[in-house]
Regions:
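Short glycine/serine/threonine-biased micro-segments
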Residues: 16, 20, 84-86, 127, ...
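Solvent-exposed, flexible loop/coil residues
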Residues: 27-29, 81, 126
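Predominantly the C-terminal beta-signal and adjacent terminal strand-loop region
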Residues: 9-10, 46-49, 61, 111-153
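Gram-negative (and chloroplast) outer-membrane scaffold detector with strong preference
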Residues: 37-122
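Short glycine/proline- and aromatic-enriched beta-strand/turn motifs that initiate or cap beta-hairpins
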Residues: 2-56, 141, 149-153
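Short amphipathic beta-strand and strand-loop transition segments with alternating hydrophobic
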Residues: 19-23, 91, 110, 130
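Transmembrane beta-barrel architecture of outer-membrane proteins
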Residues: 14-16, 31-33, 64-68, 103-107, ...
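Outer-membrane beta-barrel domain signature
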Residues: 6-10, 21-28, 56-62, 95-101, ...
Length: 153
């Protein structure tokens, strides 16, 4: 005799799509752009990995592409809310009129994830963060991204 089992499987990955904004703590400039990332959970309740890319555009005709890999510790706040704290390296490619540069930075974030249905299929996120660039000038910035979460089964 076979019994039906209800198995709540976690998604294989979660895609984050949204918008982003950044503010320089050194010179006060701001930039805005899109945000895309994929998150996986190699160690349940202990480690989530997020790889993402964010192109940011400023009024001064400069573009900054940030590509990061974050190591996050997750906490489940309720069936519909999660919090993660993470750190990781970031590659920064900057294009300004007459100049191009590549540099390495460090990033720290808090990631708030909200799942309205409780089934973790679609939701939304809000992720404030701090960046420290190790290149000459040691740029520091605060950023925030937010948008849609899509679970990949």
């Amino acid at each position: 005799m076979a019994f039906a089992q209800s198995v709540d499987k976690d998604p294989a990955a979660i895609v984050e799509l949204g918008g982003a904004a950044g503010w320089s703590l050194k010179n006060g400039g701001s930039s805005f752009g899109a945000d895309a990332a994929v998150e996986v959970t190699p160690i349940e309740n202990w480690l989530e990995l997020e790889a993402g890319v964010t192109p940011l555009f400023s009024r001064h005709h400069s573009t900054e592409w940030n590509t990061d890999l974050l190591f996050k510790k997750p906490w489940t706040l309720s069936k519909k809310a999660e919090l993660m704290a993470g750190v990781g390296p970031e590659w920064v490619h900057t294009r300004e009129p007459g100049m191009r540069a590549n540099s390495i930075a460090g990033e720290a974030v808090l990631d708030f994830m909200f799942w309205p249905g409780g089934k973790h299929k679609f939701g939304w996120f809000l992720e404030p963060g701090y960046d420290y660039n190790f290149a000459r000038g040691h740029e520091r910035s605060f950023g925030i991204s937010g948008g849609l979460l899509i679970a990949i089964p």
